[in-house]
């Protein structure tokens, strides 16, 4: 009687295992490169939306005198995006802070930010999946750092009585 129960249990486990195996057939394994690219694209688009939306006459706004202005934060974020593209291509690069004074106002910053994002997007698309599986750097660090500054920029928006683009009702 006991051996019948053991066989029944083993048969049940076997059937469950077979069902689980069948359920996973045809599914693609997770793609870290795709996840990273999607996240980087999202955070870059949020930053670009802010750069395009924030009033030009407020680009020099600072929450307090000792912090970066809106324009300086945008150039700082652009520095990270440019760094990610270069490091992602395997270039021997150090974080080289771009000089905010090199960009004269909103149009120049928005144009340079678009260029940095496009360069980074091209690098991400050209990067083989095996590279992402081995290490998500430099993109993961830049995504995290950019997200911190996104939060800072939300505060700049709110201090100016403006609702950030991502917080506005969808049309």
Task: Write out the residue ranges for each language-model feature.
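Short, contiguous alpha-helical
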Residues: 37-48, 58-97, 130-171
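Carbohydrate-interacting regions of secretory-pathway proteins
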Residues: 26, 41-45, 101-102, 109-111
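Bacterial Sec-dependent signal peptides at the C-terminal "C-region" and cleavage site
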Residues: 20-29
């Amino acid at each position: 009687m006991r051996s019948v129960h053991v066989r029944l249990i083993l048969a049940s486990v076997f059937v469950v295992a077979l069902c689980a195996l069948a359920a996973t057939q045809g599914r693609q394994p997770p793609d870290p490169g795709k996840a990273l690219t999607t996240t980087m694209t999202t955070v870059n688009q949020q930053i670009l939306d802010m750069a395009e939306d924030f009033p030009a006459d407020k680009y020099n706004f600072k929450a307090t005198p000792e912090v970066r202005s809106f324009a300086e934060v945008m150039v700082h974020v652009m520095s990270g995006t440019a760094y990610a593209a270069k490091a992602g291509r395997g270039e021997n690069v150090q974080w080289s802070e771009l000089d905010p004074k090199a960009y004269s106002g909103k149009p120049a910053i928005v144009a340079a930010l678009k260029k940095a994002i496009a360069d980074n997007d091209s690098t991400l698309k050209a990067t083989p999946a095996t590279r992402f599986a081995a290490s998500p750097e430099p993109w993961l660090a830049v995504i995290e750092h950019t997200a911190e500054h996104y939060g800072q920029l939300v505060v700049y928006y709110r201090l100016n009585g403006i609702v950030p683009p991502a917080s506005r009702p969808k049309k």
